[in-house]
Amino acid sequence: MRKYETIFILNPSFDEETVKANIEKFKGVIENGGGTVENVDFWGKRKLAYEISKVSEGFYTLVNFTANPELPRELDRIFRITDGVIRHIIVNEQV
């Protein structure tokens, strides 16, 4: 098992319930894939450094998790097909 960190940005037009539902969905992908979520840090709505698809704000969320090396690939696929995910990144935490 390896430690990973992901940050994803959701569309600012989402209401609070939709944002929370998406966070729970991504946590579920991690847990159903055999991983464990260690920390979820919701940063709220923040201004982007530059416009992405004509959007200048987004809901930021940081998630630390432990998983097998195959899980980040599946999580990346889920991020890509989910409407409303503006940007995401998954990195391996160095011990």
From Swiss-Prot:
Which InterPro entries does the entry mention?
Answer: Ribosomal_bS6, Ribosomal_bS6_sf, Ribosomal_S6_plastid/chlpt, Transl_elong_EF1B/ribsomal_bS6
Alphabetically ordered keywords of this record: Ribonucleoprotein, Ribosomal protein, RNA-binding, rRNA-binding
Entry superkingdom: Bacteria
This protein's record includes keyword Lipid biosynthesis? no
Q: Name one Pfam family in it.
A: Ribosomal_S6
Annotated GO biological processes are: translation
According to its record, what are the GO cellular component terms?
cytoplasm; ribonucleoprotein complex; ribosome
Q: Which terms does the record give in the GO molecular function aspect?
A: small ribosomal subunit rRNA binding; structural constituent of ribosome
Which family, according to the similarity comment?
A: Belongs to the bacterial ribosomal protein bS6 family.
* HAMAP family the record matches: Ribosomal_bS6 (MF_00360)
What is the purpose of this protein? Answer: Binds together with bS18 to 16S ribosomal RNA.
NCBIfam families associated with the record? S6 (TIGR00166)
Q: Write the protein's name.
A: Small ribosomal subunit protein bS6
Q: Which gene encodes it?
A: rpsF
